[in-house]
Curated annotation (Swiss-Prot):
Entry's Gene Ontology BP terms: cellular response to oxidative stress; protein modification process
Keywords, comma-separated and alphabetical: Oxidoreductase
Active site: 54
Signal peptide: none
Record's protein name: Peptide methionine sulfoxide reductase MsrA
Highest taxon in the source lineage: Bacteria
Enzyme Commission no: 1.8.4.11
Pfam family, one: PMSR
Enzyme class: oxidoreductase
Organism: Methylobacterium nodulans (strain LMG 21967 / CNCM I-2342 / ORS 2060)
Length: 221
């Protein structure tokens, strides 16, 4: 990743890069399971976006969950610039976050399990950074369009916040909101650590377990 760009505040409207009207080329199929990266996905498949630092390691966390995960992809969301490049996102002038798109079957992969994986795989108290990766594109974020799923996400945040406070951590800084447009990242980023097993992964959790199941219920149950 690009360590030398470390913008730690969101850009002002007059700083936003213009982007482009056409999507960037990306991979057509998932490198691990061979499924098409882009929708439309099969009936019953839901999607959520997770930002937890560098998306290379974050994506691997989710595809490794196995059954119930239809496909994963990395991209940019929660910003302003249309169809940004990776280099543009790293300037901090697009407003985007590096995120993982997870398309999953809630009958086989409860949303709770995705939430637990999300919270336990990073430190959600660090603001505009994850470890050595500093910048607005590394902020903790959870993006779902469905209001019920958003309520589940907020309940899980509150439960995990209590667990973190008990261990001496500060408040959670995760943003939970509607995703807005999702832009697929360039092909070389997709399933990066499957193609490059020794590649960089800056992901690291707090070691605090997320008490999913306390006031957080899966709608499919």
């Amino acid at each position: 990743m690009l360590f030398f760009r470390k913008r730690a505040e969101m850009p002002a409207p007059d700083q936003i890069l213009p982007g482009r009207p056409t999507p960037l080329p990306t991979a057509e199929r998932h490198f691990v399971n061979g499924r098409p990266l882009k929708g439309p996905y099969p009936e019953g498949i839901e999607t959520a976006l997770f930002g937890l630092g560098c998306f290379w390691g974050a994506e691997r966390k989710f595809w490794q969950l196995g059954d119930g995960i239809w496909v994963t992809a990395v991209g940019y969301a929660a910003g302003t610039t249309p169809n940004p490049t990776y280099e543009e996102v790293c300037t901090g002038l697009t407003g985007h976050n590096e995120v993982v798109l997870v398309a999953y079957d809630p009958a086989a992969m409860p949303f709770e399990r995705l939430l637990k994986t999300f919270w336990e795989s990073h430190d959600p108290t660090q603001g505009m950074r994850q470890g050595n990766d500093v910048g607005t594109q590394y902020r903790s974020g959870l993006y779902v369009a469905d209001a019920e799923r958003r309520a589940q996400a907020e309940a899980s945040r509150d439960a995990y916040g209590e667990a973190l406070r008990a261990k001496g951590y500060g408040p959670i800084t995760t943003e939970i909101r509607d995703p807005g447009p999702f832009y697929f990242a360039e092909a070389y980023h997709q399933q990066y650590l499957a193609k490059n097993p020794a590649g960089y992964c800056g992901l690291g959790g707090t070691g605090v377990a997320c008490p999913i199941g306390t006031g957080v219920r899966n709608a499919a149950e």
